[in-house]
UniProtKB/Swiss-Prot annotation:
Entry keyword Disulfide bond: yes
Keyword RNA-binding assigned: no
PANTHER family: IG-LIKE DOMAIN-CONTAINING PROTEIN-RELATED, T CELL RECEPTOR ALPHA VARIABLE 1-2
Residues annotated as transmembrane: none
Listed InterPro entries: Ig-like_dom, Ig-like_dom_sf, Ig-like_fold, Ig_V-set, TCR_variable_domain
Localization, UniProt: Cell membrane
Domain Ig-like: 22-113
Designated name of the protein: T cell receptor alpha variable 13-2
Amino acid sequence: MAGIRALFMYLWLQLDWVSRGESVGLHLPTLSVQEGDNSIINCAYSNSASDYFIWYKQESGKGPQFIIDIRSNMDKRQGQRVTVLLNKTVKHLSLQIAATQPGDSAVYFCAEN
């Protein structure tokens, strides 16, 4: 992850039926969705000179895993089930996950370079 200037936000995405316990201590923004629903995770940035944005996910007990990236000269980039949208005017990007599955339960990070 060399060259990453800032880590903007992280979000715990969980399927409603997956988590039955209570979390103690760290309170992360949480998005709970039903299996099969679409999810949207938003991220804001402040450095208008940023030209490269990356989304990672980190499953419990594992290291961060690259999901998708986008360059500042693009508005949209699509993967297999994920799409990233970049709005440079308002310095905002979003990660859309189609047909959410149990394997999507993770902490999500957005970063700039």
